[in-house]
Each structure stands twice: as structure tokens, then as C-alpha cells.
């Protein structure tokens, strides 16, 4: 009963160990399948493509393949359906022998990108091998003198299968003398013994025939038998016995031949020849053991005979028999369990199984370049291999599985810095001393178009004189590309844009290969002062890369425009001007003002005024401001002065050579009652217009009061509609700001009832601008609006936006001395916001006027022009006053506005723009104004003569 319990516990212990081992193996692989041995050809193993996450359509293009170091023909993959199937007969016992683990390791490799998968196919054991005893008939000589419970060891059966299929149970045929005893040692191995249960009597029973049956645990069960023939002897009833039944020995694998393994010692209780013992190896010892070990039959010493190799066999079990010389002889048995100790005697092996070259320099981090396999036949620490790579390279080794490494990209590549790498992979084991092996990997970096052409600087400034010949070479741009071959082939082109009403390509062109920039036509400084454009450099890569460089072509001014005289007021010609001056005026009284403009800029547009004195003109009591053009008295007038003076004012620019224009001013000295006030400057007959205007206003007020009761509902409805509908550009609500001018640098708003718009081209020197008059003259039918304008809005101008900045066109024109008294204009130039040009708008006497520092050098660059003002700085405008002058941002104009009383008769000059188109519009407007004035005078209707 105890023997049966022990056998059951041993079986369950072995079964539990096998299950735990199998569970550990399942978790150790990346992808694992199982297949029974002896499976037929074509047997389904697993859907390997689906399990690896690969599409069936990718298998052939990505070169799906299965690699194995050994037994590569046992399994195959169908590339049409991605199924792993059995290709040839699989015999587990042939593959793995008695090993508890039996697996076929496969490497699945796919390209584009390179991926490697480790697949482990477990070969499951089937019960295809029956238990086999070493011999079919075993003869045992049993002395009759043996005591009860005497034991005779039996050699158990062996089963080539594993697990449950190799779990054997034994059954002995019934006998009154013997029974079978099965014992399990600490290594879970069973030892069979035939136990004497009843004393033998040779005279009664000379022989005993027994049948020992071994049955495995498979389904169906397989059995093996051995026939035991027991012969009963009379004498020598003691067998040799060993000191221990199992000897455990450890031996280094590099042990030299003839080294003593163990010395056995057996004893026999008999005497004489029956106690003499002869040692020998067991009869069932394999030939391998017989070639590796030898035993001395007398001393019982077991020594090594051949070379031992741990990588070939890790352990040996040697059966030894001790036989006495009795008649019949008796034998004793023991087992030597020899385990070899591994030493570090094998160098690691390194192999590259897949290599993807060359690698693109824009490959993403983590890209697998090569698969490296290392192996070491040693075990334990001696077989633990680590790989290292050449330091300071943009690659690294990543361990994917045991002894498998992937060479991956660790940092970004730059072919322009390093075009090729020579890597050294070193594999080193953990032995002491350690052994290592190296292999070289050459990696070339393929170029991609990752560098755009680069210019030496982002912006170039070019100076070209105006009136250049067509096709003139003005500059050469050059860009460099760090890439190679077609990726570094650079071509140049213009970035097309509009310059005013014309395309940029009508002004300049660039040679696609050389980068030379040509002016296609003569440039005009008065039309284009600054030609700013971009040139693109683009390589021939795919996709192409490009970069831009900005060219600022400054057209240098030449003095090719003479000063042009402007009319003193609307409706008059620009020829001779007549002025009436009272005899009673004192020194410094402004008589008239000569206005002139010059289309040039810089020194060429800097105008000066001087009187041309004839013979006998020494006592002329007039002078002209050098830079203001104001004609004023030098002293008080007396009776000795001529009542009429013809003054010739020479207007001259500062160009080389200087160009001039002459203005004629006729001054008549009259009595105080005959001349208009000096501040009004109205035409003759304007003084009598006030009475007529008052009568008209009275009639208008009476008419409005008469019909107001009938129109009150209409007015309320109209007001409600006006409040509900957003104000448009043409009709702004009173007090609402009106956008005058906007540009990239800011905007300025001003609130008025009427406005004038002057539009110029789109090129930088000319921009859209809008001019407003603070006091507007109204017709006879708009007296109410006139009263509202004068009472509410004239004294409340909108202040300009403080955030605006000077535009390039405004800065360029601030060198002109032209400044209209009411609506003056200066050409823009490249000057800065701190530059101011002296004007007469301050209305200060000559001694108190600002001091002007003339330019220190000629040329288009006027940044050196400095203007210094003395104590006569213009005073700040009050809350209810208009500023003397204001600048419209983004436009080449400085507008001076003086606020006069609403009933004053001061004329307001027309807004004047530069260019031929603007002069033509001005002439047409003046003709139209003259005709209107004549009609008004004939009709005896008086209107305000202020020009907007």
C-alpha cells in the first residue's frame, strides 16, 4: 500500500513539473504555435500572417520568408493565404530525443521596412512509442538462502515519448514468492526491485517464471513486457553491496584524459571466492559512455578516456555492476550521476542575417538597418553574450530577443556632414576571462533634398541711376545648395508682383542659371523711387526646395525736372499774380506767397526763392523768403515808394545743373479802405456777399419752419432708419470717424461732411489718400448743413492715430520745400519720422522762423538732411482748433490746415497732387470753377468761396 502511494505522488509531481515548464515556454516567444508529431503533409499549424499583423497582399511585395538554422524544410508558409503548414514528416524523438522541450524556431523576415519576427513551433508528443525493456528475457539466479524481503533490482523500461506518454506504470504477474516494489528517489526516477515475499525451496521450486508489464500513460495505452526467469541456487547467498546506490559527481568539461572520476567500493558478506568482486560497466551502458569512461575491474576506479564537451552532453549516467566470484556469482549495482561543469571555451559568433543599404538621410529614428544574430555554445554566464557598437555614431543596437539585436537609427543623419559609416559590432560573453568576436558593417547614406538653396544674406540693396539703358545689368544673385547632384542644381526666378499698374517682369528680369538681374527698360525716379522685389532660388530635387532673397533697388534721382509754379488759389492761372497791399502795413507783412514744386527729390527738389532786382530797384520794400517763397515787406511803406511794383521771383532747385522757373507778382499799393483784410485774401466783391448770404439763410430758415410740422414724422422715420442701418463710406453720421487712409503701418481717421479723394498708382511712391477741408462752402440750398458744419464740426477735428508711422514713400518726399498754406503737399522720400521741412504754415515772421540747415551732400539718401528750429516752434493746437498741418499716413502729402472763423472770407486752395494725370485733373477743375464763378456773379448769388 505504501509503495502504491509513493508511486502516485511521484507521478503527480512529475506531471505538475511538466505543466509549469510548458507554461513558462509559452510566454517566452513572440509568436508560438504547436503541432503534433507525425502530422501529415499540409497539416494546418497557424495563420502566421494574420497573427503577425501582416496583410496577405504584402507578403510577396515585402519578400515574406521563413528562415531556420536547422530543420527549415519541416514547415512552410503558403504566401497566398498566410497559413503555416507541415511540409514534411516531424518526428519529435528524432528532433529532440528525451528532452522535455521540443520546439522548432523560425525567423520570419519581411522587408520594406525590414521586420523580423521570432516564431516558435512546439512539437507535441503523441503516444507513438511503446515502453521497451533492455531485453525481452531476463534470467535471475536467486539463492535459496536469501532472506525474506530480499530485493533484486530490475532495469525498468524506457519510453521514447515524453510527459504523460512516457509516464510508465508496472505490473508483475501474480506469484507467491515475489512481488514488485517501485521506489522513487529525489530525482523523480524510479527504481524497480523484485522482492522476495516467501522463502524459496529449490527442491520444491527450481525456477520461477514472471512477466513484467510496463504501461505508459498515453491514449491509447501502449505496453511492453519482459519475461523474468528466476533460477534458485543453493550456495553463495550474499551479493556485493555498494556504500551508496547513487554516486553524484561534478567534473569540468576540460578535464584531461585519465582523470579519476570516482572510486567505487563494494562489499560481499560471503567468504572466499564468493566475496571476490569484479567491477564492470552495466550491460545496458551506451557506446558513448564506453568511449568516454573506463573502469578498473579490480579497484573500481572510473577514469575519463575521451574528451568531454559540455556543449555535446551536459551529464552522464553510468550503471556499474559489482559481481562476486561465487558459484553462481552474485551482483550488486549502483549508478554514477556525472554532471559536467561548463567553462568559457567557446568564442561568440556574430552574423548579419539581413541588411538594408543604403539608408536615406531622412530616415526616421528607429529605422531597422540590419538584424544581427549572436550565439555562444557555452552556457550560463559563459554563454550570455552582449553586443556593443562603435561609439559616437548615430546608430544603436536594440535587443529584440535573446541573442538577437537590431541595428537601428538612433539620431538624425546628415549626408552633408558624414556620407558613410564603418561600424564595428563587438560580441562579448560573460565568462572570466571573457571571449569576444567582431564584425564590420559598412553603411552608406543616400542624399535627399533636405537643404534649400541659401543666399549669403537675406537682403541686398542696389543703387541704379534713373534713365539707365534698357537691358542694363544691375546685380547678380547667387545661392548655394549643400545637397548633391540634381538636388544642388539651382535655378533663379522672379517672384511676380504688381508695381503700380504694371507687372514686375516689365521692369526687371533674372537669368535662370547665372542669377544676373537686368533692368528691361529705363527707370524713372519720379515714377518708381524704390523697386523692391524677391528672387527665388529653387533646386531640382523632388520635391524642389527654394528660398527667397529681397532686392531693394533704389532709383537714384537725376535733376531732370525743373520747378513748376502753382496757382496761388483756385480758379487762377499760374502766371502773373496781382496783390493789393494797404499803405499802412508795417514791416514783415506777408504780401503774397510763391508756390512751386519739383518732381525730383533730395537736392534736386530742394527749392530756394530769390528776387531778381532790376536797375533802380534798390528801394523796393519787399523781400522773399529763401525757402518759404513768402513775399513780405521789409519796412513800413511811405509815399516815396512807387504805387505799383512788378516783382520777379526766381525759383531754383539745387541740382547739378540747377533748373529754374520765374514767377511774376504785381503788387499795387492802395489805401486801407480799398484793400481787403490781409487775413481774408478774397476776390473783389467778396465783402458784399455777406448780406446776400444772410438773406438767403433767412429765407431758408423760414421755409424750413413752415414745413417742419408736415415733415416731423418723415424726419423721425428717416432718423430711425439712419440709426438702424450701418453708416457707409459715402454717408457717415455726424461725429463718426471716417477712415481717411490706411496702410500696412497704420491708419488715420477724420470726421467731415465732405471729402475729396485723390488716387494714385499702386507703386510705393504713390498711394491712395483722402484730403478733407475743415470749413466747407455750401450752396444756397444747403444753408442748414452749412450751419451745422460750422457750429458743430469745424471746431472739432479728429486727431490722427498716434500709432501710424512714416511710409517709405512719405519719407522720400520730405526733402521738397513746397508746402501749401491751406492744403500743402510734399513729395515722399526715404527720410525718417524725425525730419521736418520748413514751411510758411507757421505764419511766423522771418526773424522768428525756424533755422534751416542745408543738406551736407547730394543724392537720393536724404537721411543726412537735418532741420533745426529756433524759438519759433509751432504752438500746440487747442481743443477746438485744427492743427496747422497734418500728415496722412501712407501718402506722400503733408496737409496744413488753419482754422478760421466761420464767416471769414479766406479762400481755401485746392488739393494738388503730383504727376501729369493730377495736373490735368487740376486744370480741368480750375476751368470748371471759373465757369461756375462767372455764373454765380451774374446771378447775384453769394456763396462761400472756400475751396475743398
UniProtKB/Swiss-Prot annotation:
Glycans are attached at residues 257, 265, 362, 548. Residues 30-133, 157-242, 243-350, 351-455, 456-565, 588-678 form the Cadherin domain. It comes from the Eukaryota. Residues 1-22 form the signal peptide. Gene3D superfamilies: Cadherins. One of its GO terms (cellular component) is plasma membrane. This is Protocadherin alpha-2.
Amino acid at each position: 500500500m505504501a509503495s502504491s502511494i509513493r508511486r502516485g505522488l511521484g507521478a503527480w509531481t512529475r506531471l505538475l513539473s511538466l505543466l509549469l515548464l510548458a507554461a513558462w515556454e509559452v510566454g517566452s516567444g513572440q509568436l508560438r504555435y504547436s503541432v503534433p508529431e507525425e502530422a501529415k503533409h499540409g497539416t494546418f499549424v497557424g495563420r502566421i500572417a494574420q497573427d503577425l499583423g501582416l496583410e496577405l497582399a504584402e507578403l510577396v511585395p515585402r519578400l515574406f520568408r521563413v528562415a531556420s538554422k536547422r530543420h527549415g524544410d519541416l514547415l512552410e508558409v503558403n504566401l497566398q493565404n498566410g497559413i503555416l503548414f507541415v511540409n514534411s514528416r516531424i518526428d519529435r524523438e528524432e528532433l529532440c530525443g528525451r528532452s522535455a522541450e521540443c520546439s522548432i524556431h523560425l525567423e520570419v523576415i519581411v522587408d520594406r521596412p525590414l521586420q523580423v519576427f521570432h516564431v516558435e513551433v512546439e512539437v507535441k508528443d503523441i503516444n507513438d512509442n511503446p515502453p521497451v525493456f533492455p531485453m525481452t528475457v531476463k534470467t535471475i539466479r536467486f539463492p535459496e538462502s536469501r532472506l525474506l524481503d530480499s530485493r533484486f533490482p530490475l532495469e525498468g523500461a524506457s519510453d521514447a515519448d515524453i510527459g504523460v506518454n512516457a509516464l510508465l506504470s508496472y505490473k508483475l504477474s501474480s506469484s507467491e514468492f515475489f512481488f514488485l516494489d517501485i521506489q522513487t528517489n529525489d530525482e523523480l526516477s524510479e527504481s524497480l526491485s523484485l522482492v522476495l515475499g516467501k522463502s524459496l525451496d529449490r527442491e520444491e521450486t527450481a525456477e520461477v517464471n514472471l512477466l513484467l508489464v510496463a504501461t505508459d500513460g498515453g491514449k491509447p495505452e501502449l505496453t511492453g513486457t519482459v519475461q523474468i526467469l528466476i533460477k534458485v541456487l543453493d550456495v553463495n547467498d550474499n551479493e556485493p553491496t555498494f556504500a551508496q546506490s547513487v554516486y553524484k559527481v561534478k567534473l569540468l568539461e576540460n578535464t584531461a584524459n585519465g582523470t579519476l572520476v570516482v572510486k567505487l567500493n563494494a562489499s560481499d558478506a560471503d567468504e572466499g571466492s564468493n566475496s571476490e568482486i569484479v567491477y564492470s560497466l552495466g550491460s545496458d551502458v551506451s557506446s558513448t559512455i564506453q568511449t568516454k569512461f573506463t573502469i578498473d575491474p579490480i579497484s573500481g576506479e572510473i577514469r575519463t578516456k575521451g574528451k568531454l564537451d559540455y556543449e555535446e552532453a551536459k551529464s552522464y549516467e553510468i550503471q556499474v555492476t559489482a559481481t562476486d566470484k561465487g558459484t553462481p556469482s552474485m551482483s550488486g549495482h549502483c549508478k554514477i550521476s556525472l554532471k559536467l561543469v561548463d567553462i568559457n571555451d567557446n568564442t561568440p559568433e556574430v552574423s548579419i542575417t539581413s541588411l538594408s543599404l543604403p539608408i536615406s538621410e531622412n530616415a526616421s529614428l528607429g529605422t531597422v538597418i540590419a538584424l544581427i544574430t549572436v550565439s555562444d555554445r557555452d552556457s550560463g554566464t559563459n554563454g550570455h553574450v552582449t553586443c556593443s557598437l562603435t561609439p559616437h555614431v548615430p546608430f544603436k543596437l536594440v535587443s529584440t530577443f535573446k541573442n538577437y539585436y537590431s541595428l537601428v537609427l538612433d539620431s538624425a543623419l546628415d549626408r552633408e556632414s558624414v556620407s558613410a559609416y564603418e561600424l564595428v559590432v563587438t560580441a562579448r560573453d560573460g565568462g572570466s576571462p571573457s571571449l569576444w568576436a567582431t564584425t564590420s558593417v559598412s553603411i552608406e547614406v543616400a542624399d535627399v533634398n533636405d537643404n534649400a538653396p541659401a543666399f549669403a544674406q537675406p537682403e541686398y540693396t542696389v543703387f541704379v541711376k534713373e534713365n539707365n539703358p534698357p537691358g542694363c545689368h544691375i546685380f547678380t544673385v547667387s545661392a548655394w545648395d549643400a545637397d548633391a547632384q540634381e538636388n544642388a542644381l539651382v535655378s533663379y526666378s522672379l517672384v511676380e508682383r504688381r508695381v503700380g499698374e504694371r507687372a514686375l517682369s516689365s521692369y526687371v528680369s533674372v537669368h535662370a542659371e547665372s542669377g544676373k538681374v537686368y533692368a528691361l527698360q529705363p527707370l524713372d525716379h519720379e515714377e518708381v523711387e524704390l523697386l523692391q522685389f524677391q528672387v527665388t532660388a529653387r533646386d531640382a530635387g523632388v520635391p524642389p526646395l527654394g528660398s527667397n532673397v529681397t532686392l531693394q533697388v533704389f532709383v537714384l534721382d537725376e535733376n531732370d525736372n525743373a520747378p513748376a509754379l502753382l496757382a496761388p488759389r483756385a480758379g487762377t492761372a499760374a502766371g502773373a499774380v496781382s496783390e493789393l497791399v494797404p499803405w499802412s502795413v508795417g514791416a514783415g507783412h506777408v504780401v503774397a506767397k510763391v508756390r512751386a514744386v519739383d518732381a525730383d527729390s533730395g537736392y534736386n527738389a530742394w527749392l530756394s526763392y530769390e528776387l531778381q532786382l532790376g536797375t533802380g530797384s534798390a528801394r523796393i520794400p519787399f523781400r522773399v523768403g529763401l525757402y518759404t517763397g513768402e513775399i513780405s515787406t521789409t519796412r513800413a511803406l511811405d509815399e516815396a515808394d512807387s504805387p505799383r511794383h512788378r516783382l520777379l521771383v526766381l525759383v531754383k532747385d539745387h541740382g547739378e545743373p540747377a533748373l529754374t522757373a520765374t514767377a511774376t507778382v504785381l503788387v499795387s499799393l492802395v489805401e486801407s479802405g480799398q484793400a481787403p483784410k490781409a487775413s481774408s485774401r478774397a476776390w473783389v466783391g467778396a465783402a458784399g456777399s455777406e448780406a446776400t448770404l444772410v438773406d438767403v439763410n433767412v429765407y431758408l430758415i423760414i421755409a424750413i419752419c413752415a414745413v417742419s410740422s408736415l415733415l416731423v414724422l418723415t424726419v423721425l422715420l428717416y432718423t430711425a432708419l439712419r440709426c438702424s442701418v450701418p453708416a457707409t463710406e459715402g454717408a457717415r453720421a455726424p461725429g463718426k470717424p471716417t477712415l481717411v487712409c490706411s496702410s500696412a503701418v497704420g491708419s488715420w481717421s477724420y470726421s467731415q461732411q465732405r471729402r475729396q479723394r485723390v488716387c494714385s498708382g499702386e507703386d510705393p511712391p504713390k498711394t491712395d489718400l483722402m484730403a478733407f477741408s475743415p470749413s466747407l462752402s455750401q450752396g444756397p440750398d444747403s444753408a442748414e448743413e452749412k450751419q451745422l458744419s460750422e457750429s458743430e464740426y469745424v471746431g472739432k477735428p479728429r486727431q490722427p492715430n498716434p500709432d501710424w508711422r512714416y511710409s517709405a514713400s512719405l519719407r522720400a518726399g520730405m526733402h521738397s520745400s513746397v508746402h501749401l498754406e491751406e492744403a500743402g503737399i510734399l513729395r515722399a522720400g526715404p527720410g525718417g519720422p524725425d525730419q521736418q521741412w520748413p514751411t510758411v504754415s507757421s505764419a511766423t515772421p522771418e526773424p522768428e522762423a525756424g533755422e534751416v540747415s542745408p543738406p551736407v551732400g547730394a543724392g537720393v539718401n536724404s537721411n543726412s538732411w537735418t532741420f533745426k528750429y529756433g524759438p519759433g516752434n509751432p504752438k500746440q493746437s487747442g481743443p477746438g482748433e485744427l492743427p496747422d498741418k497734418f500728415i496722412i499716413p501712407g501718402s506722400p502729402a503733408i496737409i496744413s490746415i488753419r482754422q478760421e472763423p466761420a464767416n471769414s472770407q479766406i479762400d481755401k486752395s485746392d488739393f494738388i497732387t503730383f504727376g501729369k494725370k493730377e495736373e490735368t485733373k487740376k486744370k480741368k477743375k480750375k476751368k470748371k470753377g471759373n465757369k461756375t464763378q462767372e455764373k454765380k456773379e451774374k446771378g447775384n448769388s453769394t456763396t462761400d468761396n472756400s475751396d475743398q
